[in-house]
A protein has these predicted regions:
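Rossmann-fold dehydrogenase core element
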Residues: 102-119, 139-145
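N-terminal Rossmann-like dinucleotide-binding module
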Residues: 1-43
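Active-site loop of classical SDR/Rossmann-like NAD(P)-dependent oxidoreductases
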Residues: 283-297
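Contiguous beta-strand/loop segments that form the cofactor/metal-binding neighborhood of enzyme cores
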Residues: 174, 180-259, 293-305
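Predominantly a Rossmann-like dinucleotide-binding segment in NAD(P)-dependent oxidoreductases
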Residues: 120-205, 333
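Hydrophobic residues in well-ordered beta-strands that form the structural core
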Residues: 49, 89, 114-116, 226, ...
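C-terminal helix-rich "cap/oligomerization" subdomain common to oxidoreductases
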Residues: 53, 63-66, 112, 219, ...
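Beta-loop-alpha module in the N-terminal Rossmann-like domain of NAD(P)-dependent dehydrogenases
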Residues: 15, 45-106
Length: 333
């Protein structure tokens, strides 16, 4: 399969690595010439500095990965779909539901697939708990607690689009949209939301919150609390999801949902989980579990053999919708 990369920042390095294992990286594009040139040289790809030029000249591409700033995902995805190329869009799908709908419409009109990266779904503990829920082993789920306690220091936001309302969108979009995705994937849609937001440690650096608390009520009656911050001192502390059910309690914990921290389930024990991948490393900070290998394996198997896809655009939209509702329920900072 023939791939292109739109955006050559840090996450693009991860994409390029796995594209090379699943096909051929034909072209890369970034408005910063040096970034495009370095990645192109490493993978013997053509370098472009304008997406329109790339789409005009590269006529035999199968898939393009969109790795540009959040606020540009929609325009870049739509242009690529209209050029007749399947799209794999980094998270978040976009930063408004309207943009997500426009992306899906472009996909349908072009007859090309639109995928959204949802790498946390491939974490071994996450998949184990999803099986528990699908098999009904927890019985009725009563409530949940989602904790996202990470660190993003001032250097992370310097000389960058990160922290901008227009291009970043908010802490839930950039840091924690994968966690919100898991709530929808495991428990369904949200009915009611009430949130409190604040910016304590990043005043003058970012245009939105660095801390938030949200109370959630799901359509199926489950209630839950989301507690998140990027003010954990010096390093990431915790990324965890705890479910309280009729027949059991289970906590996926660690820094990035990478282990089972607690379980007490009637007549069942989660055991012998594979170790999983490490976290994505971005210089001085860490991200979620590095599962882009599984993202690309899933994408290729879907396109070649019609196997089930874990990364549908409609589910990407639902993540953005839930985040929009959290932000709408509180006064933005």
């Amino acid at each position: 399969m023939r791939f292109a990369l739109i955006g050559c920042g840090r996450i693009a390095q991860r994409h390029a690595e796995h594209i090379a294992r699943n096909g051929q990286l034909i072209a890369v594009c970034d408005i910063v010439k040096e970034k495009a040139d370095v990645l192109a040289l490493a993978y013997k790809a053509a370098a472009y500095y304008d997406i329109d030029e790339l789409l005009q000249k590269e006529k035999d591409l199968d898939v393009a990965a969109i790795c540009t700033p959040n606020g540009l995902h929609a325009v870049h995805s739509i242009k690529t779909l209209q050029a007749g190329i399947h799209v794999l869009c980094e998270k978040p799908m976009a930063i408004t539901v309207t943009d997500c709908r426009n992306m899906i419409r472009a996909s349908e009109n072009a007859g090309k697939s639109l995928f959204v990266v949802k790498q946390n779904r491939f974490n071994p503990p996450v998949q184990a708990v999803k099986r528990l829920l699908d098999e009904g082993r927890l019985g009725q789920v009563y409530s949940l607690q989602l904790n996202c306690f990470w660190n993003r220091d001032p250097a992370y936001y310097q000389n960058s689009w990160k922290g901008s309302m227009a291009l970043d969108g908010g802490t839930l979009f950039t840091q924690f949209s994968h966690f919100i995705d898991l709530l929808f994937w495991m428990l369904g849609d949200v009915k009611n939301v009430q949130a409190l937001l604040a910016n304590y440690g990043h005043k003058g650096m970012i245009e939105f919150e660095d801390t938030g608390i949200a109370m959630l009520e799901f359509e199926n009656g489950v209630i839950g609390a989301l507690n998140y911050t990027v003010n954990s001192h010096r390093k990431n502390m915790e990324g965890s999801l705890t479910l309280f059910g009729e027949k059991g309690t289970v906590k996926i914990g660690g820094e990035y949902l990478n282990r089972i921290d607690y379980q007490d389930i009637e007549d069942y024990t989660i055991q012998n989980l594979p170790a999983g991948n490490g976290s994505n490393q971005y210089g001085t900070y860490q991200g979620s579990m590095s599962n882009h290998d599984k993202v690309y394996e899933n994408l290729v198997k879907y396109l070649r053999y019609g196997e089930p896809i874990y990364m549908s655009a409609m589910e990407g939209l639902k993540t953005v919708e839930i985040i929009e509702r959290i932000y709408a329920s509180a006064s933005r900072v």
